Design a protein with these regions (language model features):
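Generic leucine side-chain signal with a strong bias for well-ordered alpha-helical environments
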Residues: 23, 58, 74, 93, ...
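Short coil turns that connect the paired helices of HEAT/ARM alpha-solenoid repeats
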Residues: 25-33, 59-65, 98-102, 135-141, ...
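Amphipathic alpha-helical scaffolding segments comprising HEAT/armadillo-like alpha-solenoid repeats
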Residues: 13-26, 47-58, 80-97, 119-135, ...
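Structural detector for internal amphipathic alpha-helices that build alpha-solenoid repeat scaffolds
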Residues: 2-14, 29-46, 65-84, 104-121, ...
Length: 252
């Protein structure tokens, strides 16, 4: 095993000129830093060059980390996929979401699904075809799943149940979840009185010095909320400064 003390840059140098067989060996036998660097390098091969590695070795592995890396690779292959390849990968990701018992594999597959919807501008037709198959994701209350769903939902077609899911998770105590959901709400231009009131309530429970506090205020500014004005005034009075996130929102 490679020492855990190696950095991302060490891994980059070590994997820079390796063949696909050597990269596979890194994925199978290294620590996570080297595994993911090797995986990123494998993404620069054509799909038909790494298809057997993905399907017959990584996805067939009893180790969840190998399966997680397999679906990670599939989401961001850098060489353009043809329709047959894209459909095959979509099927693999949906299967992993539905049937793999590992939460880390499921969340990685959801992230990859989002990347494909974004990169290939997949829309209503493709989502309709997989929608029922992935409906279990809305009921899994696990941190990594919620993050993955929040990211990917930015590139899925509009659905009221997705909007409700996101609003529900604005109550999360995890700052990263709040960040992703605010990003998605902004991207989708979702706004409503219920979102506004929920976020105002969150401000009352959030440390004024936290990044989350500033993100919430920036979002409220972006939807032209008048209720946020006292909170901005309070920042100016108590801190004599405006965070970059808020400043950029005010400029728009």
């Amino acid at each position: 095993m490679v020492s855990e003390n190696f950095s991302n840059f060490d891994a980059f140098l070590a994997c820079k000129n390796l063949s696909k067989t050597e990269l596979l060996n890194k994925v199978l036998n290294s620590n996570s830093v080297f595994q993911y660097e090797a995986a990123r390098k494998l993404q620069f091969f054509q799909y038909n060059e790494i298809r057997d590695i993905i399907k017959d070795i990584l996805l067939a592995s009893r180790y969840s980390r190998h399966r997680e890396i397999a679906v990670f690779i599939l989401g961001q292959i850098q060489v353009q996929l043809n329709d047959v390849e894209l459909n095959e990968i979509l099927s693999i990701l949906v299967y992993s979401i539905c049937h793999d018992k590992s939460i880390s594999v499921k969340s990685s597959a959801i992230f990859s699904l989002g990347h494909l919807f974004r990169h290939y501008n997949l829309g209503e037709k493709v989502f309709y075809e997989i929608e029922k198959d992935i409906n279990l994701i809305w009921d899994i209350n696990r941190y990594s799943i919620i993050l993955a769903v929040a990211f990917s939902s930015a590139y899925f077609p509009h659905r009221n149940y997705i909007k409700k899911y996101l609003i529900k998770n604005l109550n999360s105590k995890k700052s990263q979840i709040i960040s992703w959901i605010l990003y998605l709400l902004r991207e989708k231009r979702y706004k409503s009185k219920s979102i506004e009131l929920l976020l105002i309530n969150r401000l009352n429970q959030t440390n004024i010095n936290s990044y989350t506090y500033n993100e919430i205020i920036a979002f409220l500014i972006s939807i032209n909320s008048m209720k946020v004005i006292p909170y901005i005034e309070n920042i100016l009075l108590t801190q004599n400064r405006v965070d970059n996130e808020i400043y950029l929102a005010l400029k728009k």
